[in-house]
Design a protein with these regions (language model features):
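Short glycine-/aliphatic-rich beta-strand segments at the starts of folded cytosolic domains
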Residues: 1-9
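Short amphipathic alpha-helix segments
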Residues: 10-24
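Small side chains
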Residues: 19, 31, 40-42
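C-terminal structural segments of small proteins and small subunits
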Residues: 22, 42-68
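Short acidic amphipathic segments
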Residues: 23-32
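RNA-recognition motif
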Residues: 32-39, 67-68
């Protein structure tokens, strides 16, 4: 399954790295984060809830404006 997380608050490549690391630490998640698109495209295997994805991004210091 693929989900797109819309993220606010990323300003630089370091932000992208922090957001990527936060998502990739979750078991079953492989994320590609884009500063330009202000999103993360996650390939998910297993049972990972939207709340888990949202909490990982918020814990990294960013805001989630939507998950599709």
């Amino acid at each position: 399954m693929t989900k797109t997380i819309h993220i606010e608050g990323m300003m630089c490549p370091h932000c992208v790295r922090f957001a990527t690391e936060a998502l990739n630490k979750l078991e079953g998640v492989s994320a590609v984060v884009s500063l330009e698109q202000k999103n993360a495209v996650c390939t998910i295997t297993g049972d990972v809830s939207d709340d888990t994805l949202r909490n990982a991004i918020v814990a990294a210091g960013y805001q989630v404006t939507g998950i599709e």
